[in-house]
Amino acid sequence: MVRHGTPRTAFPTLFTERRNIMKNTIFTGAAIAIITPMNADGSINYDELGELIDDQIKKGTDGIVICGTTGEASTMTDDEHLDCIKFAVKQAAGRVPVIAGTGSNDTAYAVKLSQEAEAAGADALLLVTPYYNKTTQRGLIAHFTAIADAVNVPIILYNIPGRTGVNIDVATVKELAKHKNIAAIKEASGNISYAAKLIAECGDNIDVYSGNDDQIVPLMSLGAKGVISVLSHVIPAETHQMAQYCLDNNFAAAMKMQIEYLDLINDLFIEVNPIPVKEAMNMIGWNAGPCRLPLYEMSDEHKAKLRASLRKHGLVK
């Protein structure tokens, strides 16, 4: 098995107090939006998930985001969803924070799942904006507030309008940031101007994380605290280092890495996430397995392009 990257020597404090308000920063650096390895029959491969969590932590990953988009939470049963969260908490064993995806377009269900994740030991929750039955900005405030009122762990809002069809307005984030449990936002709109305004107007009361690997350095140069990454699957140490350079204000070194890996990042999203990253993990020696339908096997043309990109960066022979 070819597994690249070198471990870092020490981990920063998992939770650091912000100066301006009494909230905690969940993590700084690079957290992984981790895949859910599957067996050939589509069942969850917990052995491989455990190995992957351990490998990521050893190589410097700063947090584990379980049951997110990349983890195929939308095709999990309720029992599988909660079991994965419990498993990740046990496997991480306090070495890095575990952030559980508990968002839904059903507020009552999101409250229930969030409470269960908290009881299971999740350090924080990731809550996507309601999708399909799209709501207004006032509805978003009511939705997220209902969940935040029901738990006692920090929440990361998840703005990804390309999937949900709704963008969280900066004014809405500013209002939500007044809640003691709403600590951060994963910004995955791809709109740098929006991100800049978000950080400028809300950054004193809420942390911002990049949700796009091709914008790690741009967003962190504006003041984002890190990234929730897919790239970290294949180059965990390097992804951590890129984010760490930003935290150390060494943006020249960080941008050099960002540019170096842009082709790999693009190819990891050549089809709908997480199809390419699971294929990449299989290629480099992990047993990531297939995706669950409706996500379908990658085309041969795209497989060849992805393999060439992995080869260029020394990840496969």
Where in the sequence are the language-model features?
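Structured C-terminal cap/extension of enzyme domains
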Residues: 214-317
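Ligand/cofactor pocket segment of small-molecule handling proteins
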Residues: 122-124, 131-136, 140-225
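Short beta->alpha linker loops
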Residues: 102-105, 189-193, 211-214, 234, ...
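A general structural signal for well-ordered alpha-helical segments in protein cores
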Residues: 49, 81, 85, 110, ...
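Short secondary-structure boundary segments
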Residues: 68, 129-130, 188-189, 212-213, ...
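Short, Lys/Arg-enriched N-terminal segments with co-localized hydrophobic residues
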Residues: 3-21
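Surface-exposed amphipathic alpha-helices with a cationic face
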Residues: 86-93, 115-118, 148-149, 177, ...
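Active-site beta->alpha loop and helix N-cap motifs at the rims of alpha/beta catalytic domains
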Residues: 24-32, 36-165
